């Protein structure tokens, strides 16, 4: 086999290997990366009953707690949506703070959350230090 053919074969093999590796890495990341929509984006999405994630800020004086559920308004400062959630809220959940909710959006503008994640900045300090 000539040097030129051998080099072409090795280059082709490396290219195929790298292409397969990139494909598998991206496929795995797609399943694990957690993107979220803004409230404005989520409202205009077609209602296909697939779970989505929506991020925004909790509107001040909107949190209503009962024994079985928590209802609050979430906004992206353009539009807002009412969120209903049954379960234990994260410790950092508070009004005027960031939140990401995972669940389903309904046609009436209500979001039924399965999971609530409290967002915070990278400079988190415990309440003791504040």
From Swiss-Prot:
Subcellular location(s) per record: Cell membrane
Matches recorded under Pfam families: CcmE (PF03100)
Topological relation to the membrane, as annotated: Single-pass type II membrane protein
Ranges facing Extracellular side: 29-130
Listed GO CC annotations: plasma membrane
SUPFAM superfamilies in UniProt: Heme chaperone CcmE
Record protein name field: Cytochrome c-type biogenesis protein CcmE
Annotated gene: ccmE
């Amino acid at each position: 086999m000539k040097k030129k053919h051998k080099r072409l074969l090795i280059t082709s093999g490396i290219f195929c290997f790298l292409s397969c590796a990139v494909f598998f890495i991206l496929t795995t990341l797609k399943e694990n990366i957690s993107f979220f929509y803004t409230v404005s984006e989520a409202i205009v999405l077609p209602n296909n009953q697939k779970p989505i994630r929506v991020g925004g800020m909790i509107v001040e004086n909107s949190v209503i707690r009962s024994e079985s559920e928590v209802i609050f308004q979430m906004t992206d400062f353009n539009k807002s949506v009412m969120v209903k959630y049954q379960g234990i809220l994260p410790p950092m959940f508070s009004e005027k703070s960031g939140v990401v909710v995972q669940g389903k959006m309904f046609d009436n503008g209500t979001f039924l959350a399965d999971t609530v994640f409290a967002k915070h900045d990278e400079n988190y300090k415990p309440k003791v230090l504040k």
